[in-house]
Amino acid sequence: MSCSKPRQTRFVSSLLLLAALVAAKPVLAQQPGAAADETTVGVLAGLLAASDARRFDVAALREGLSHANPAVRRQAALAAGRIGDAAAIDLLLPVLNDSVPTVQAAAAFALGLLKDARAIPSLLEKIRAVSSTEQGEPQLEAVTAIAKIGGDQGARALIDILASGSPGSTTPVVNAALLESWRLGSTRAPIAELVRFTDAFDAATRWRALYSLARLRAAAGAAPLIRGLSDPDAQTRTVAARGIGKALLDSAHLDPRAAVAGLRRLLNDPDAHTRINALRALASFRDSTVAAAIVPLVADRDIGVAVQAETTLGVVGGSAALVALRPRLTSSVFAVKRQALIAVAQGDSSAGVAAAVAVGNDADWRWRLVAAEVFDAARARDRLEGQLADPDGRVVARALQALQRIVPAADSALLAQARVLLRQSDPAVRSVAADLLARHPTEDDIDLLVTAYERAERDPFNDARLSAVSALGAIAASSPAARQHVATRFVSATSRPDDYLVRRLAADTLPDTRDAWGPVLPIATGRTLADYRDVARRWLAPALAGTNPHVFLDTDRGTLDIELLAAEAPLTVAVIIDLVNRRYFDGTRWHRVVPNFVVQDGDPRGDGWGGPGFAIRDEINPVRYETGTVGMALSGPNTGGSQYFITHSAQPHLDGIYTIFGRVVGGASGVAVLNAIGQGDRIRSIHR
């Protein structure tokens, strides 16, 4: 998993999703909420149905966009964007002039989802129509939309916006343009303008400019980022530390000593998130002389700082690092012991392998999986191959992933093992095995992969099925003859899959399926109009009237009060509440924690592959990722299920990409619980 992309395994089953919604009804019927007239419920249901199926229903959208209730008009605008059909542009442009600002903002947001440059002139007009003192949500969303649309026209528009301000005098729109400029990419982003604003009087302006420069990895941004390490503003220091790295300094031909000195100072910063970012940045220099400054932080009171310190010591290496890490190998805290084992292996592969032998024989599969992570770090192929015989598929899958990383693609022995494991009972193992075969495509594997695809139809999640399609696509792309053989032995012989995700992947990797299987859209959601009316009546309408449901997440470190945002993601909230009512999440453990990024769970398997047996479509909304925001983890568009993540801090690069459906409330106490969670900690219960 990438640190920037929370991941959730892929699966879809319309029947299972329908069963979940039906099962929820008796419980949902008991929920309090503001009453809504049935006519409005019907309009909302029609919008939900069209959006969920990704079906451009012009009648439903027109009805919603012209509704007397502005909250309904806002829902219609969001639906138009989520459906993703460019035909919605003509419906949305007039809504930029709606009488209610929140509706205008939703229209701008939706136009950003559609990413069509035809909207840019109208979005610019919306921005310029008011004075700087009147700039609000519609103008800010218009800026974001322009950045998402991008291209040469979007870049020119953002440059014009930035030209309207100066480092000594900025506006909300200018600040928004600074924060969103990274979306343009390194070839179009206004690098010089971003650098100019890093010296702004207002800290809110400085950190936004630095954030985009950091995301762009722009050489011109290296010097401003180094200066930012000494900024009096905590957020600016944190952003600067996040953006610094050896590769960036090398590209700018800068001596790293000033940056390293600045990062070392931040190891004593009062803000834990700043210390974490500084540690992560120091790792990029792989300089063992900094180990002495890092060692004290392995005992930091903040679990995120302590684990990141271990991580960085493993990367920088050296005797001082290993001496500091060895006592951590006996820690009773899972997150601390796990990372210490991996870090020792990074610094001394032999010592790491020796330390992992004991956990590799542990009765608890979680520790055997950690052993696979350690052997991966040590590049211990023989140990990893031994783990392929583990009785638990979760361990086998992790070992096979490690072998995929460290063994050349054409290695005949590993390919032979992959062919055997393609018959394994665990879907995750079969998925990785198929991925291995895709790296070295050969026609000899066609029938084996077709059989794997057919077997995967019965799996509880669809990763193995998708991987088989990807591998067959790689074979088909290897030669015209291979394409013909795949078309004959797979495409023509296989009926159109119900799984939208399989159809979408096949359309991209196996062009012959476009004719044989028909169009990818619309999606068969498994829901009836009555189901959508139920969601609209029980969750969406009350939320539009100001009543949001809450769930309480009891952990080993305390309780998190989570407000569910049904007005932003009604179908997602309905599914989550059903899973909560079924006590689906009780007794699981946080399987992924990345310091100063996210905590993630919702996986009944506990290894990141699991899900509820169905997928839900994205409900991308304008809410931003701030501290304590709850989002749906994905492995690609429209692959949500039960896995969720909670952000430790603001993560603007996730905005508008992952569905936000909740937020931690309760102020500092909630944040304290969130920051205390370590990987492997238990989730005792999630309840209403």
Describe these PLM feature segments.
Residues 13-23:
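Bacterial N-terminal signal peptides
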Residues 29-78, 82:
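N-terminal leader/linker segments that initiate helical-solenoid repeat arrays
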Residues 37, 55, 70-71, 86, ...:
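Alpha-helix N-cap/helix-start positions at coil->helix boundaries
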Residues 38-44, 74, 105, 136-140, ...:
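Alpha-solenoid HEAT/ARM repeat scaffold
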Residues 48, 81, 112, 147, ...:
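Structural signature of alpha-helical solenoid repeat scaffolds
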Residues 53-64, 85-97, 116-130, 151-165, ...:
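Amphipathic alpha-helical scaffolding segments comprising HEAT/armadillo-like alpha-solenoid repeats
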Residues 78, 109, 144, 160, ...:
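Residue-level signature of alpha-solenoid helical repeat scaffolds
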Residues 426, 444-688:
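Cyclophilin-like peptidyl-prolyl cis-trans isomerases
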